[in-house]
Amino acid sequence: MINPLRGMKDLTFDEAQRFVHIVKTAITIAKRYGYSYIETPILEETALFKRSVGDSSDIVSKEMYQFEDKGGNDVCMRPEGTAGVVRAFISAKLDRQPVKQKFYYYGPMFRYERPQKGRLREFHQFGCESFGEASVYEDFTIIIMISQIFQALGIGFELKINSLGCPECMPPYRQNLVGFLTEISEDLCTDCNRRIGMNPIRVLDCKNEACQSLLKQSPKLIENLCEHCDTDFKKLTVLLDDAGIAYEVDTNLVRGLDYYNKTAFEFVSNEIGSQSAIAGGGRYDKLVEYLDGKPTPAVGFAIGIERIMELVQMPETKKEGYYMGAMIPEAIEKIIMLGNRKRATDKVTVEYSSKGFKSHMKGVDKANARYALLIGEDELKNGTVWLKDLETKEEKSILLSEV
C-alpha cells in the first residue's frame, strides 16, 4: 500500500469539513475589509525566497524543498505565501498604480522539517497582504481582522506584539546586540554563533531553551527605537487598549523571516502544545523594493490552518437537501432524472439501487438529508412520490410534476 510521504497527510471527513469551514470564514471576513483573491504558483525561483525570507533564516538555510528542474533552473516549492504575492504584485505592475491593493490567499506551503503535532512538511495557510498603506492604523486593522476570524471560529488566543524598528534605528541597535552576543557566544548554540556575523537579529528567534534563557538579558530594540517608530508603536498599543484587545509586548519577537520591519505580531494558543503560534505577521515596507518593485509600504499576516484545526468550534450541522431512492427497479431511472432536475436548486443524494423502506431511511440519516423522497410500486403507477420532512416529521404523497 502506498501511503502519504512523511510529514504530509490527507484531509478527509471531519478534517476536510473543518478546513473548508476555516477558509470560508476567513474569506468572508477578509472580503468585508476589501481584500480580493489572488492565486500564485506553488513552484517559484529559489532566488525569490533567498532575497525575501533571507539566506540566514532557518527556512532558506535548512527547510526548503529546493531542486534543479529539467531546464536547469534553481526552483523550490514555496515555504510561505507573502514573497509570492509580492512577486505577483510587481509582475502585474500593480506597484506602479496609485491605488491601494489588498489580497487574500490560501493554499499549501512546504518546509522540510521534523514533523510534529501542528507542524507538517506540507501545511496550509490563509493569508492577507495589504499594499500601499504606511499608517499604523492599517497594522491595527489587520490585527482586529485576525481577532475577528478567530472569534468567528470560536478560538481563544493571546496576542504578542513588538517593533522591529526601521533603517534609522536598526543599525545602532544591531551594533549593541552584536556586542552583547559576542560576550556570551561561547554559551550559545552553533546556529546562533553562525548568525552573529550574518544576521544577529535572527539569534533572537533561536528556539534552543538554553539560548532563550541567555537572550532574556539582551538589549531591547523597543528601548532603542527612533522617534517615528516609537510613536507608531505607542499608538498601536493605545489603539489595542481602546479596542479591548489584550496583548503582551514580547521584546524578543522577531518572526522567522528577514523582511519584517516596525510592527511584528503573533497570535498564540496554549492549547496546542509547544508549537503555540497560530498566526503571525507584520509590516514589510522594503520588500517590494528588494524584489525590484517601486517602494511600497505593506503589511500582512498568515494563519496556520492545521494549527487551528483542532481548536475550531464547528457549527451544528443542519439537515439539508434531499435523499431520493427507488423501492422497485423500474423506478430507478425516474429517481435519477428527478435527482438531476432537483440539483439545479438543492443538494441531492440519489441511491442508484432499489431497496426496502428501512434501508432507504438509514440512507437518509447517513446523508443527513432533510427530505426523504421515495418511489415504490404504487407511486410509479400513480405518477407520485412519497415525501417526508425529517424535521417536521410531516409526510405526504405528491405528484412527480410538483417536486
From Swiss-Prot:
Leading EC class: ligase
Any Gene Ontology biological process: histidyl-tRNA aminoacylation
Signal peptide (UniProt feature, chain positions): none
GO molecular function, one term: ATP binding
GO cellular component, one term: cytoplasm
Record keyword Protein biosynthesis present: yes
Locations listed in the record: Cytoplasm
Enzyme Commission number, as recorded: 6.1.1.21
Keywords linked to the UniProt accession: Aminoacyl-tRNA synthetase, ATP-binding, Cytoplasm, Ligase, Nucleotide-binding, Protein biosynthesis
InterPro entries assigned: aa-tRNA-synth_II, aa-tRNA-synth_II/BPL/LPL, Anticodon-bd, Anticodon-bd_dom_sf, His-tRNA-ligase, HisRS-like_core, HisRS/HisZ
Catalyses which reaction(s): tRNA(His) + L-histidine + ATP = L-histidyl-tRNA(His) + AMP + diphosphate + H(+)
Homology family: Belongs to the class-II aminoacyl-tRNA synthetase family.
Complex formation: Homodimer.
NCBIfam families given in the database record: hisS
Protein name: Histidine--tRNA ligase
